[in-house]
Amino acid sequence: MNYGFVKVAAAVPHVKVADCKFNVERIESQIAIAEGKGVQIIVFPEMSITGYTCGDLFGQQILLEEAEMGLMQILNNTRQLDIISIVGMPVVVNSTVINAAVVIQKGKVLGVAAKTYLPNYKEFYEQRWFTSALQLTEDTARLCGQTVPIGANLLFETSDTTFGIEICEDLWATIPPSSSLALQGAEIIFNMSADNEGIGKHHYLCSLISQQSARCIAGYVFSSCGFGESTTDVVFAGNGLIYENGSLLARSKRFCMEEQLIISEIDVERIRAERRINTTFAASQANTGDKKAISIATEFVNSKELTLTRGFNSHPFVPQGAELNEHCEEVFSIQIAGLAQRLVHTKAKTAVVGISGGLDSTLALLVCVKTFDKLGLPRKDILGVTMPGFGTTDRTYNNAIDLMKSLGISIREISIQDACIQHFKDIDHDINVHDVTYENSQARERTQILMDIANQTWGMVVGTGDLSELALGWATYNGDHMSMYGVNGSIPKTLVKYLVQWVAENDMDEDAKATLLDIVDTPISPELIPADENGEIKQKTEDLVGPYELHDFFLYYFLRFGFRPSKIYYLANIAFKDVYDEETIKKWLSTFFRRFFNQQFKRSCLPDGPKVGSISISPRGDWRMPSDASSTIWLKEIEDL
């Protein structure tokens, strides 16, 4: 099972200008290598059979005939191969020459994609030799003894995907042909190019491909000629680039004197999910113009079992490398802006936050502090309330106190033990029975205290619960589940950790930094069960519901793309290959789906809070799900894995 992935390649072969025999040999060699690696579709550079820099030689009959003979040789020598190949060559149609991409498979020409926009400025003179697809009067051409479709509007359909083609300058047009092709069904765009180099041009090219890939919600495979093309006036660096919905998957080395084969896998299921979600894409389909695409059916008859070469980030909510700092700053700024508007609108005089010494309440407090600073309000009007209970440890208690002191906010300490003991007596609950009643009573007592203090001080209770907890329902209904404004509600646990660490290292004095970093290293726990005999945290959340890094991974692919459990399981086994075994992943995947469905009733009445990333479970916005939906089909698929 390929789980919606299509393996593609951008080839950058050696070339000799006007030496079709040499070029065909190099093309055949790379096709064979790609076939051996399980590639399903491969694209070569523009005019790959002749070379792009032939100039006025394109008017020579012998070169045009040699090109067709070269194509015939490729057809004969790849007749037994399942791979679809896209090669570039001049094609004669009614005494005109077309700059063409010829699509071939198993000895047959499937179709000829014609270049629409012929550059005729600066170093380019293509209109001197070629005719645009816009001037074609026929929709078929004779090539290698076959009558085949020709045009700029061809779509090639397989059971795995539908793809279209544009050629070099087409991408640079105001409305590229790929836009129309995508709107009519193309999920992958292949571009064969002869893109010469200039200072700053490569960065612009990558930006252009990224944007077009994102705008079309498509995969984009780009192959441009390299070593061997004439350097009389320009230089070609051999750019091979593969993008998926704006993100770079693979790229070639520039200015490399060796042949290159750039391989990756396009996730067509992901593209389809994005298009389903993005209703603007569907609305745009009415604007495809009068020239409708011509569909050409083919198939990957002998497709091998897919082996992925692309990687998957085990923490999809957390950017890698230099982007992390920028991402953290942006997330923090969104939280601050959301809370600032709500404080101004409600004219709240205080912000009330329950401080446990854990990650979530720490992040919420940091947001409050920076919001008050932004609004020019005194930090003393932030009321940090620590409420020790039966499971509170010295470590979390001391961290809570130290953090509040270092930030200069007002501190209130109210033990919940006496109130809970009285409550247990009132409802006739044995204090030695540490069940759900025992735990939830403490959470609700804390929420009641915070709400009453907010009323007492004309304030607002700022919620601390994060996206991961809310997805799993790991919150007490009408306890920590409830607040007057939740600043962490769309931030997953894996990102909360990095946010707190980022603030510690970039915006805190040494005392506050030390406390924050210790909080980052503290085991995640609601501390509702008494500590162990050594005073350490006994109730560890990840021992009970599973690792948050796994649940965040499941959550991302379930909500963001609507993937089925089997595909999420497949991807998780790749992403966490050296961390968790298959049975562990399966166990917690089942837990995730069971809890996600069972706990929707808590998400149906969430307090307001800002959307920060691409995923939110606000019942008023991104996620509208009935509280009594059945999880049967999801759990059954996991059971069958």
Each predicted region: which residue ranges?
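Enzyme catalytic cores with a strong preference for nitrogen-chemistry domains
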Residues: 1-352, 370-379, 411
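ATP/NTP-dependent adenylation/nucleotidyl-transfer catalytic domains that generate, transfer
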Residues: 7, 23, 159, 216-218, ...
